[in-house]
Swiss-Prot record:
One of its GO terms (biological process) is negative regulation of DNA-templated transcription. Gene3D superfamilies: 3.30.450.40, Winged helix-like DNA-binding domain superfamily/Winged helix DNA-binding domain. Residues 1-155 are annotated as: GAF domain. The keyword Transport does not apply. GO terms for molecular function: DNA binding; DNA-binding transcription factor activity; GTP binding. The modification Phosphoserine is found at S215. Belongs to the CodY family. This is Global transcriptional regulator CodY. It comes from the Bacteria. One of its GO terms (cellular component) is cytoplasm.
Length: 259
């Protein structure tokens, strides 16, 4: 298969993924097929975002790493010493992706390390490994292009997370600002009583203790529930079960108290 055709396969993977959640496993499989090697996509902290095996490596330690989806911390940190593509590292290299305890079995093992860069930051590392056949220029072009695509997807995922965080915070702030002074006071007492993300509340007890009407508590809870910040369920005489759905709510409530 020609280089241009292989590049187009990577392109189509990117186009197919547009707007969908990132699937690093599919990315690894595509790169495996076009480069004909084992592929490991690592995050900055060594989490295995995706991988695909072309040539099996029968080794208990490697098997556990794949199951745990985590590469050793020391190895991951050492990868940051490689600022640009480093190809055809042999079994004796500290960066080898082959188990050194089986050096005799993987004597012909070659590893290529490609930094994943995005927005000027090191986002992770793309590791390629195979037996015997050296990685040639075409392989390295595809690997670097693949790393760029992976970097773009990591950045997109991060941007979506930041957007979701901002949206959650805005919803909470709007919900809290819709509360009257007495309703806000009631909510503060309710969540002091719950002491966590969920629990059972007896509205009449809090109303008596704080000196507010039960209807103020009911209205406050209704406003938060309609905003999707909490969910509540009446359990009759036992009280009302409350669960926080938006993880920004308790943080914002705490911030209000400290001001």
């Amino acid at each position: 298969m020609a280089l241009l055709q292989k590049t187009r396969i990577i392109n189509s993977m990117l186009q197919d993924a547009a707007g969908k959640p990132v699937n690093f496993k599919e990315m690894a499989e595509t790169l495996r097929d076009v480069i004909d090697s084992n592929i490991f996509v690592l995050s900055r902290r060594g989490k295995l975002l995706g991988y695909s095996i072309n040539q099996q490596i029968e080794n208990p330690r490697m098997k556990k790493m794949l199951e745990d989806r985590q590469f050793p911390e020391e190895y991951t940190k050492s990868l940051f010493n490689i600022p640009e593509t480093s190809s055809n590292l042999d079994i004796n290299s500290e960066y080898t992706a082959f188990p050194i305890e089986n050096r005799d079995l993987f004597e012909s093992g070659l590893t290529t390390i490609v930094p994943i860069i995005g927005g000027g930051d090191r986002l992770g590392t793309l590791i390629l490994s195979r037996l015997q056949d050296t990685f040639k220029d075409d392989d390295l072009i595809l690997a670097e292009y693949g790393a760029t695509v992976v970097g773009m997807e990591i950045l997109r995922e991060k941007a979506e997370e930041i957007e979701e965080e901002a949206r959650s915070k805005a919803v909470v702030q709007m919900a809290i600002s819709s509360l009257s002074y007495s309703e806000l006071e009631a909510i503060e007492h309710i969540f002091e009583e719950l002491d966590g993300n969920e629990g059972l509340l007896v509205a009449s007890k809090i109303a008596d203790r704080v000196g507010i009407t039960r209807s103020v508590i009911v209205n406050a809870l209704r406003k938060l529930e309609s905003a999707g910040v909490i969910e509540s369920r009446s359990l009759g005489m036992k009280g009302t079960y409350i669960k926080v759905l938006n993880n920004k709510f308790l943080i914002e409530l705490e911030n209000l108290k400290s001001h």
